[in-house]
Amino acid sequence: MPFAAAVFADLARIRQNAPLVVNITNNVVTNATANALLALGASPAMTHHPADAAELAALAGALVCNMGTPGGENIEAMLAAGGAANAGGVPVVFDPVAAGVTSRRREVAGRMLETVRLAAVRGNASEILALAGEAALSKGADSQHASREAAPAAVALARSLGCTVCVSGEVDVVTDGERVVELAGGHAMMTRVTGLGCTATAFVGAFLAVNPDYFAATCHAMAVMAAAGRLAAAGVAGPGSLAVRFLDVVYSLTEAEIAAGARVSA
């Protein structure tokens, strides 16, 4: 099946089935992430309480854990929900926001990797390098490395964790430790809208909920981000307009638009 057709088939399943995607995310992006998942066709649930998160995770199609604001309850919720998801066979996606920047974030990322069996990890190059134990430069949550620089670390991390790893950037790199795919598309203006990386992680969760091939599902989610970002940026005055238009584009995205807006290479 052509790549765009495979992406759209998964997107159609999301739109038809509205999988429950449980998010334990940061307090900067909660509303934006929920709206993006709704535009995609998924059903978002946003939670921070450990007991609540664990119960929801057991019912979910996927669990998304984002450590952007690593407060105590958030982290305990991620660990509790991760355990419940693992017990129920629910895929878990981890977004290690600014993983190597502070000792607190290094500690939280380490606990997640040690405690929860992950289906996928999505981060920028600095975050993936930090998770892999390599030196990385970052400015807060922003990477100071190109995504391709982190490709070898992503492969090693995918092998050690037994999961799919996505390094997002101007070119997205997705690997399961054996296969490596690059996805180009999107628009530079996307870096001026806070939370679109978190949206990408949430989209990975939605695609994992409908496709048991987690490598393919991650590629498909990033293709939707690339195609929608490119279309949303066309003709807008700036990032404020892009943020609004992105939801509209995702809501009505077609197979032809995916084919035109996301370029894949192995």
UniProtKB/Swiss-Prot annotation:
Catalytic reaction equation(s): 5-(2-hydroxyethyl)-4-methylthiazole + ATP = 4-methyl-5-(2-phosphooxyethyl)-thiazole + ADP + H(+)
Cofactors named for this entry: Mg(2+)
Known pathway: Cofactor biosynthesis; thiamine diphosphate biosynthesis; 4-methyl-5-(2-phosphoethyl)-thiazole from 5-(2-hydroxyethyl)-4-methylthiazole: step 1/1
Signal peptide bounds: none
GO biological process, one term: thiamine biosynthetic process
Keyword Magnesium appears in the UniProt entry: yes
HAMAP family to which the protein is assigned, alphabetical: Thz_kinase
Family indicated by similarity: Belongs to the Thz kinase family.
Protein name: Hydroxyethylthiazole kinase
Organism of provenance: Solidesulfovibrio magneticus (strain ATCC 700980 / DSM 13731 / RS-1)
Upper lineage: Bacteria, Pseudomonadati, Thermodesulfobacteriota, Desulfovibrionia, Desulfovibrionales
Name of the encoding gene: thiM
